[in-house]
Amino acid sequence: MPFFHNRAALLAGALLATSACGGNGAVPSNAVAGNPSLRVGVPQERAISPDDNTSILKKLKKDVVIGSTVDPTNGDTGPRSIARVTISYGKLKKGQLAVCDFADASGTPGNGTSVDVLDPTPGSKPTTFVQSSKIQGCDGNALSSANNTYAAGLTSHVVVKYDQNGKYVKTYGTPINAPMTSGDAFCGQPYAPEDIYVGDSKDGGITKFAAGLYGNPRPVEVITGFGVNNGSGWGVLGPSGIRYNGTRHGSLCNDTLYIADGVDNTIVAISKASNLLTTGEIQVKPGGKTFKCKQKRFTCATLVYSGSPLNAPVALALLPNGNLVAANTQGGNRLVEISASGKLLATKSVDKSSIAHVFGLLAIGSNDGNTVLFYTDTKDNSVHELEP
């Protein structure tokens, strides 16, 4: 049995044993810390992506409106996060775009309760996938490999799981306080863990829980200390823009998690993210540029980039070549492209307005020539596509 499969089997055995003794089916965090063999991870290619100095943002000259994100049922507005459907299953079709509405029909931020779906072609019309007060202030809609949606509600203070047909499954609360993003992490390998990460704008933490069969199904705040600004509405800042690099080469996976810190104007990389399991395993020190890692041999954080031209970034996109694009929410609607090693590659303003309008980013493609970048625009309540 390969090393990774053996570790997965060990955790599965631990889950069964814990369930038999305690009835909750979860591995206690102290048990994992005391026995490193219980950690479920993926075989890593390397901690950080190979550096690529090719700017994709410079190639994206054309801005195309894909379609409105105004919910057809209740008129919710203010498109926030954006995710792509990767398989056709249930009501969702491969290639479709799912968008969270943060505002209601009157434009009041924090009152939106909808997740809408639209096709990735110009002229698309949105359809309501989920609508519930459970996700009030919807600002995150991570999509799992099984088309489960994990919608984050900033105002409702929880993350809610919905199945492939938009039916309610489960609510995730404490230690989640004020979720401002949710992201899925999966390498697509047999026995590999699939996890959901949630950024919290109240305490600056990152909470993790398993979306699949392997790992801990209970929420654990694995990272603490990111900056928060105690803002309101569109001005809330904290750890956000969560993106996972699950690029595979054979049986090896990159396994790097990226987080934008809008308070400290940084982008942070978490190596071997699948190994994050215990409470406070990584602590972000004041200023957001240095870190304390309890188990460095398993996982740790590094600073990718800090300072100008980053200016209160909220959204983050991971490009196919490993570069990152962040969207500023102060000083204009500027996109900033940075390599995985922290080299500034390009900037691009998509709106001359001084008011922030871009809160969601998503890149798709397989190479430098066919990469496109979707962004949500709260000015016209639509999804745009930047293409060559």
Located regions from the model:
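Short loop/turn segments that connect beta-strands within beta-propeller blades
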Residues: 118-123, 163-167, 210-215, 272-275, ...
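Structural signal for beta-propeller blades
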Residues: 107, 115, 157-159, 204-206, ...
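C-terminal motif of bacterial Sec signal peptides marking the signal peptidase cleavage site
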Residues: 17-20
